[in-house]
Amino acid sequence: MASKLLRAVILGPPGSGKGTVCQRIAQNFGLQHLSSGHFLRENIKANTEVGDMAKQYIEKGLLVPDHVITRLMLLELENRRGEHWLLDGFPRTLVQAEALDRLCDLDLVITLNIPFETLKDRLSRRWIHPPSGRVYNLDFNPPHVHGMDDVTGEPLVQQEDDKPEAVAARLRQYKDVAKPVIELYKSRGVLHQFSGTETNKIWPYVYTLFSNKITPVQSKEAY
């Protein structure tokens, strides 16, 4: 195992397969997969101060502002100073990236570039189990029973912003907000971009990249 703690971030638009790639990285390299969405749900559920602040925005259908999500994530990262980790969903904006700079230096930033039309198709086929955050896709990750969560058997829902008419606007917004973040990490020489439509084809390159930074915990690539 490398003596230096690995600090990595994964960027990508909604529907890019970030969650799947994160799971594989965590499984193969023993990194903690730290998801901003997961921490938001946990803090809202626990009625923490920052969770209550975030809830006020979410209930109004608003984006959680930079200062709230940054406070939440920096608190979580402070508690994990001794761990290798992979950040997913943070930083989303330049303000968030600059706040993260004050805590640590990043070793790797990977961004997934997926064609616009592919993302639109994927998102409109996406259904979720809100209590857990589990995501299903009717094409490549369908539930065992149509419309039902595999673990609990509870009904799945399609988010309003996953409906086709909302998807294009979300993708445009992501592109506008993410561009300066991507440029920042590119200028520092830590950005690695992966393009394609299938996670299984991108994965070997991601595996090789991480293998050069940290010793895999498994002897072969886990799919």
UniProtKB/Swiss-Prot annotation:
The keyword ATP-binding applies. AMP binds at residues 36, 41, 62-64, 89-92, 96, 170. GO terms for molecular function: adenylate kinase activity; ATP binding; CMP kinase activity; dCMP kinase activity; deoxyadenylate kinase activity; GTP binding; nucleoside diphosphate kinase activity; nucleoside triphosphate adenylate kinase activity. A ribonucleoside 5'-triphosphate binds at residues 15-20, 126, 135-136, 199. Transmembrane segments: none annotated. Residues 35-64 are annotated as: NMP. Keywords: Acetylation, ATP-binding, GTP-binding, Kinase, Mitochondrion, Nucleotide-binding, Transferase. CDD domains: ADK. Its EC number is 2.7.4.4, 2.7.4.6. One of its GO terms (biological process) is cellular response to hypoxia. Gene3D superfamilies: P-loop containing nucleotide triphosphate hydrolases. Monomer. Interacts with SLC25A5/ANT2. PANTHER family: NUCLEOTIDE KINASE (PTHR23359). This is Adenylate kinase 4, mitochondrial.
